């Protein structure tokens, strides 16, 4: 089968953890695939606002699957699909995270707003070279401008279980990137990168079988499983590798270029 759409995760895949931007070798390899006629989509837990200028060097993706599948965007920056949190979902998260003094942020079009503990987000972002356009939102009022379509928090897994005991009827999912990590995307039921791949494929007139997906984290597993060909990086989680059709090289120093 001739694959027509390549979806690439950023952090831990296109961008090794040691780099502030994707290696030039990876950028060149993706451009070559695009020049050969394959459409390129960036599939990331970041909102579109969190992919800063220069992070992808000179890449010009045809599509974006952002906020873990909640925001689909075209090459010009127009939303193709948007799955916003409801007021009930958002308020439940804020109440719970405030009760336990846990860091929480929401994704909007202009920035990621840290509603709780901006300082902790700022510290972790700098330590991991993420630069995800996070601003101090502790006034907790930006949802009055628009409702968020992405959410990320830091909490132990046992506290995620406690949230589900209290608010399980909401159907929210806590998608941790890696075993042992306390950072997780918090998604609506049915929203993930795999669903985003399928939704984008439909909008582009393609089938999921015509797509290749490359990722490394637990939050990539649905995408790797949904694609016609799923490739997990060697540095990826066990769940990502289990969901993929094959395992590629380590993201360091420029694993995508070595595929």
Task: Label the model's feature ranges.
Residues 27, 31, 221-225, 241:
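Alpha-helical segments flanking ligand/cofactor-binding loops in enzyme cores
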Residues 226, 231-259:
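Asp-based, Mg2+/Mn2+-dependent phosphohydrolase catalytic module
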Residues 41, 65, 212-214, 231, ...:
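Hydrophobic/aromatic beta-strand patches that form the interior of the parallel beta-sheet core
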Residues 59-60, 68, 170, 226-227, ...:
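Short, structured coil segments at secondary-structure junctions
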Residues 2-19, 224:
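Asp-based phosphoryl-transfer active-site loop
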Residues 100-103, 107-214, 218-222, 226:
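Conserved acidic, metal-coordinating active-site core of Asp-based
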Residues 21-122:
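Active-site phosphate-binding/coordination module
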